[in-house]
Amino acid sequence: MTNIRKSHPLMKIINSSFIDLPAPSNISSWWNFGSLLGICLALQILTGLFLAMHYTSDTATAFNSVTHICRDVNYGWVLRYMHANGASMFFICLYLHVGRGLYYGSYMYTETWNIGVILLFAVMATAFMGYVLPWGQMSFWGATVITNLLSAIPYIGTDLVEWIWGGFSVDKATLTRFFAFHFLLPFIIAAMVMVHLLFLHETGSNNPTGIPSNADMIPFHPYYTIKDILGLLLMITALLMLVLFSPDMLGDPDNYTPANPLNTPPHIKPEWYFLFAYAILRSIPNKLGGVLALVLSILILIIVPLLHTSKQRSMTFRPLSQCLFWLLAADLFTLTWIGGQPVEHPYVIIGQLASILYLSIIILLMPLTSLMENHLLKW
């Protein structure tokens, strides 16, 4: 008799995706982040669902409902901080996952890569809308500033902003629709993750060498299930340390002040995971130019496969490209730091230089270095 996991219509799909899936024998811990992201998404949906049971999306009661969750709901504070810091873990895993893709040339699987970039945009949109929900000062002003950027679009900008707001300012209608979309998007993301995996399983995983590994594959279970569990334990440990010891470390103190349209906070800034893009936005003095740079800072990932000029897929054996990659990583840390600083000298010029460097590494320096490496290897 055939094993049920190989014959049952539903079990068959799970089996071919997570159990008998052929995987390269040499993939490192950098390949753990895909499964960690799946777990992060599940955790966010679960904690978010329970938070939504107690949250009210009304300007008069939103702030108090979050306070009520923390004070009166059984383990409500755990739910709230798991959800808030879970988002931070989500983005740490996301950025490491994208970084892995850039380093090892995984972007050559263009369908998987492009769906991944769309997923990145969707997660960023979800996180932004979630940040508005507690209706603190930074929630309100963050929503006002970021949505107002759309007014830079010629001709339709102002109408578009008022349409998104549902009025002439960020108000009751805005909060309600942001809650609706914040609840809906994670399920759309989950569906897109399925498509992401579907395309990945068409080609199979890449590996650190960048060389096809069809001749040397091992089953996903038990080898990579146990390896993923180790990654999961480390991530859960980090998350619990954050939630139980310093839950507000990554948040903004201004968000403990209820939203007040008449009082602007001295420094309006988003959560830490958006600071690099915020720094790029601020480094251009023109409003429309800044908005375009902001979108391009992420959208640039779409054209990375087109800019691949090397005859090798991975950076494992390309020391010059490795230097550029780590320069790019350092540049992103610099941009993140600048995004959290006030708009004054010397932060402005540092931000502008870091923004120019970010774009030039990806568009210009990486492809040129790859060509040079080809030449050095007489290819």
Swiss-Prot record:
InterPro entries reported for this sequence: Cyt_b/b6_C, Cyt_b/b6_C_sf, Cyt_b/b6_N, Cytb/b6-like_sf, Cytochrome_b, Cytochrome_b_C_euk/bac, Cytochrome_b_N_euk/bac, Di-haem_cyt_TM
Transmembrane segments: 33-53, 77-98, 113-133, 178-198, 226-246, 288-308, 320-340, 347-367
UniProt membrane topology term: Multi-pass membrane protein
Pfam families per the UniProt record, alphabetical: Cytochrom_B_C, Cytochrome_B
Sites where the protein binds a ubiquinone: H201
Localization annotation: Mitochondrion inner membrane
CC per GO annotation: mitochondrial inner membrane; respiratory chain complex III
Keywords: Electron transport, Heme, Iron, Membrane, Metal-binding, Mitochondrion, Mitochondrion inner membrane, Respiratory chain, Transmembrane, Transmembrane helix, Transport, Ubiquinone
Single GO molecular function: metal ion binding
GO BP annotation list: mitochondrial electron transport, ubiquinol to cytochrome c
Binding, heme b b566: H97, H196
Cofactor(s) demanded: heme b
Entry note: cofactor: Binds 2 heme b groups non-covalently.
Positions with a binding annotation for heme b b562: H83, H182
Subunit structure, interactors included: The cytochrome bc1 complex contains 11 subunits: 3 respiratory subunits (MT-CYB, CYC1 and UQCRFS1), 2 core proteins (UQCRC1 and UQCRC2) and 6 low-molecular weight proteins (UQCRH/QCR6, UQCRB/QCR7, UQCRQ/QCR8, UQCR10/QCR9, UQCR11/QCR10 and a cleavage product of UQCRFS1). This cytochrome bc1 complex then forms a dimer.
Function description: Component of the ubiquinol-cytochrome c reductase complex (complex III or cytochrome b-c1 complex) that is part of the mitochondrial respiratory chain. The b-c1 complex mediates electron transfer from ubiquinol to cytochrome c. Contributes to the generation of a proton gradient across the mitochondrial membrane that is then used for ATP synthesis.
PANTHER family attached to this UniProt entry: CYTOCHROME B
Family designation: Belongs to the cytochrome b family.
Name assigned to this protein: Cytochrome b
Lineage: Eukaryota, Metazoa, Chordata, Craniata, Vertebrata
